[in-house]
Amino acid sequence: MKIISNPLELKEYLKDEKRSIGFIPTMGALHEGHIALIKKAKEQNELVVVSIFLNPTQFLKGEDLDKYPKKDEADRQICKLCGVDILFFPHVDGIYGSDEVSLLAPKIRGFVLEGQSRPSHFNGVLTVVMKLLNIVRPKRAYFGKKDAQQLNLISLMVKQLFMSVEIVAVDTVREKDGLALSSRNAYLTPAQRQEALKIATSLRSATAMVMRGIFDSELIIANMREILSPLDISYVAIVNREFTELKRVEIGNSVILVEASLGSTRLLDNIWL
């Protein structure tokens, strides 16, 4: 496995690459969810590139940038064992300059749900993903469905900026008890982790209601909020694949989303129906 930190060096290294490139951008603290992305990339491409970059521009003031889990050596070993060809490990000053050009998230889709409570978050996400895609120039880039709003906005960016990359969505990986894997799970105390299971339980209950023929969003959301109590709920929402709120679930075109906090730890989860 080759490790590169300089963006220009990586661009030069890949400049004449004829093999198909699969790319997985991460912020490190890799887990089974990231491994699933790597495996999918290896199935579909001849060369796999993983980036590890804790992007400061997607964190708001007072958020967990400084305490975000850092496991650099473990991450290197995971990538090596998974057969990653290139690990891109850039520094902040290699990605961002003093006179920075940034992307702005769409006025509607980028500022609802997670974007409402974190108003500049998706500006930072889109900017760094755009930079990374321009450096690596992959055929395909891989993102988890757990971060559904992020996935939607990145797909929209790629489409509207006429970028030649396929965005591949990979199913959420869960613990045996249903908790969606997240690097932030490391923050949870044992008691908080037990409480966090209410998130997956609420989504299973919503799915069961739909299977019984209950499609009314208001009824489903009310039931989910009851299950989630007393968690600190940022939002429970039912949207279509364009992230417009739905009054009724549309099978094949719906995402049910939850964001809730336990202490200072925010957890996201969703189900695609």
Curated annotation (Swiss-Prot):
Protein name: Pantothenate synthetase
Pathway: Cofactor biosynthesis; (R)-pantothenate biosynthesis; (R)-pantothenate from (R)-pantoate and beta-alanine: step 1/1
Chain residues that bind beta-alanine: Q58
Higher taxonomy: Bacteria, Pseudomonadati, Campylobacterota, Epsilonproteobacteria, Campylobacterales
Keywords: ATP-binding, Cytoplasm, Ligase, Nucleotide-binding, Pantothenate biosynthesis
SUPFAM superfamilies the record matches: Nucleotidylyl transferase
Annotated catalytic residues: H34 (proton donor)
Pfam families membership: Pantoate_ligase
Binding site for ATP: 27-34, 144-147, 173, 181-184
